[in-house]
Amino acid sequence: MRDRPHSPPASPWWTPAVHRDRRPILLARNRIEAAIRGYLADQDFVMVDPPGLQRSPGNETHLHAFATQMIGEDGTAQARYLHTSPEFSMKKLLAAGEGRIASLGHVWRNRERSARHHPEFTMLEWYRAEAPYETVMDDCIRMIGLAAQITGVSMLRHRGLEANPFAEVERISVAEAFLMHAGIDLLATIDTDRGNDAHKLAAQMRTAGLAVPDDFDWSYLFTRILTEKIEPRLGIGRVTILDRYPASEAALARKSADDPRVAERFEIYACGVELANGFGELTDAEEQRRRFGIEMTEKERLYGEAYPLDEDFLDALAIMPEASGIALGFDRLVMLATGAEKIEQVVWVPVSE
């Protein structure tokens, strides 16, 4: 049998021909960044520059960090990590007295490389002290519109899907989205006293025609439904705010005042792509410690490793004012505003394979 012909490898990004094709997108990226910095300045935000090297990279089960060592002059090594978000540092600044702060910088996440993921990427994160979380929602929607204005497009586009950044935003709760797109009554499976009922959720999944593995817990099933049935249907035609996450998935968000089953956590989608993740921020240090413990126990079970807690962060959280915050994937925003298909098309220098 003759060998099948194969395509030659793609030219590196630094070859003149490839760079010539990429350059218009990269220049658009710079213009979007300038416009967003202008918006933040108009809103009286202070730009801050948190260090990437941290004692703890973050304490979420499924986020994987790059580990390194910090070696002192005496040769003693201390474990350090590249942060997965500047959140801990920025909340320390809120505790110190800053009121409106923003950071546009690189973050690192291991085990992530795909059309929508890059191991080193640019995150825009900002916080407003003494502000409801709807305020940072509004900030983000305005920035999405700015990106479209700067690139001169009326629709955000990604792989055949479109979203109008100027149309009225769809805001729905996670429970509403599960009912609408999967036919699942999520709140019926949540009990703040006895814990979430994984078997109730599994039964609804089977009724909806979704496969259920032999070994499961509630959080795993929730994530499966969200990624397979819900997320691909969000932000189609217009931008979607997915709000009021289950309290068990609150991460660093406070519980909703009107329903302890859900939290002030939201995500923003366009063209089926998650662009941003925001919170009405939790300021209860002991509750945050409890949540981190649960996350790291599960991480140890699944991946055989856990990250240390940042005790300084927990101390700062105890004196931090009420606040709202949000993290926006800047590269993804550029990708949708320019119609790029892969995230590597919108970064000046991709990480080497």
Model-inferred region functions:
Residues 2-135, 143-145, 231, 335:
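Class II aminoacyl-tRNA synthetase-like tRNA-binding/catalytic domains
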Residues 285-353:
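Active-site pocket scaffolds in enzymes
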